């Protein structure tokens, strides 16, 4: 405070006017970053929702999300944040009653028969996991394997699929595998670049 500012707050208090002064500008900036992030996240959700209007449940691809490449039987089901972004992106969890990081049997996966398989961010292990699935006779009857629809989940500063600010991008990325996917990849890259620039620059 300067002397004049202190006197001003005293006068306000004398007249019953509540007031607050702040000098922690880092905190104020953090609030601005948070508000900007929420705007970006909600904007991406609305963008995808606008493309999914009229999409029937039976048109949504069933998605199996494998938690990590080192354990192909650990999955994230419909009762998890992963299941939520799958739904927002235009798909539906092939194991809707399972929660987060649950161990299932290969038989239950075969019976569920997912249209799409996504393997959670596993660094340099993810490609080996994809090849292992493709080579394993037990998985060959699954639609996602037969149609070569097995994908590695992206990683940025942190895996996009869980507990990350880049969850805002995850919804856009996941939408690429829905029936209403955005054929104009330029839009996706523009949104990706804008997100990275806006969130990073403001920190």
Feature map (PLM): residue ranges:
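Short, solvent-exposed coil/turn elements at secondary-structure transition points
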Residues: 69, 92, 99-100, 123, ...
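Acidic/His-rich segments in extracytoplasmic proteins that coordinate ligands and/or metal ions
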Residues: 1-32, 39, 96, 100-141
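Active-site phosphate/pyrophosphate- and oxyanion-stabilizing loops and adjacent acidic/basic residues
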Residues: 83-84, 107, 172
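Extracellular/periplasmic periplasmic-binding protein-like sensory domains
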Residues: 128-156, 164
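Short, glycine/charged-enriched secondary-structure capping and boundary segments
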Residues: 77-80, 132-134, 166-167
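Alpha-helical, coiled-coil/dimerization segments enriched in small aliphatic residues
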Residues: 74-101
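Extracellular/periplasmic catalytic domains that process cell-envelope and extracellular macromolecules
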Residues: 13, 55-59, 87, 110-112, ...
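Extracytoplasmic substrate-binding proteins
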Residues: 2-72, 149-203
């Amino acid at each position: 405070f300067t002397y004049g500012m202190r006197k001003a707050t005293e006068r306000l208090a004398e007249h019953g006017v509540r007031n607050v002064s702040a000098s922690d500008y880092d905190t104020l900036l953090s609030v601005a970053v948070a508000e900007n992030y929420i705007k970006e996240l909600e904007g991406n959700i609305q963008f995808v929702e606008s493309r999914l209007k009229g999409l029937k449940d039976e048109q949504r691809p069933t998605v199996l999300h494998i938690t990590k490449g080192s354990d192909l039987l650990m999955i994230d089901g419909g009762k998890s944040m992963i299941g939520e972004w799958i739904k927002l992106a235009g798909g539906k969890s092939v194991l809707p009653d399972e929660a987060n990081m649950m161990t299932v049997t290969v038989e239950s996966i075969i019976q569920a028969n997912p249209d799409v398989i996504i393997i959670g961010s596993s660094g340099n292990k993810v490609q080996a996991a994809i090849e292992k699935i493709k080579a394993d006779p037990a998985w060959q009857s699954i639609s996602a394997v037969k149609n070569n629809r097995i994908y590695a989940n992206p990683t940025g500063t942190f895996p996009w699929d869980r507990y990350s600010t880049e969850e805002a991008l995850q919804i856009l990325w996941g939408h690429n595998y829905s029936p209403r996917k955005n054929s104009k990849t330029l839009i996706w890259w523009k949104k990706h670049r804008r997100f990275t620039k806006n969130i990073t620059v403001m920190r």
